[in-house]
């Protein structure tokens, strides 16, 4: 009987430990994860290269009601349509952009290309990863709300 009680207590302890780890992950996701739509996303990595703010601030926001995307590159604004579903499929475009010349125009064109070739997305905490057939194209970070700074 003591042996059975010891096994039950050990099993309960093990279950409690694994549950605790799971809760930490969920707490992280709950605290930092942002919804795909209605969140301002800022580009931090493009085709495997970090994008420092001095290279320009690249942002997008996906509107939940209208299926519209809007944002900006280093010097131009962009807008267009998008479609997303529960399987994390994401199609962006066609996009329209203003046509101002700027020093970071090549980077801006790569940003637009990454957006329009996106087939899927993934999310981890405050990060949004844009993928094209499984290949990572861009990583964006949720722009903090004014009360989060």
Predicted regions and their residues:
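Lipid interaction determinants
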Residues: 17-149
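Sec-dependent bacterial lipoprotein signal peptides
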Residues: 1-15
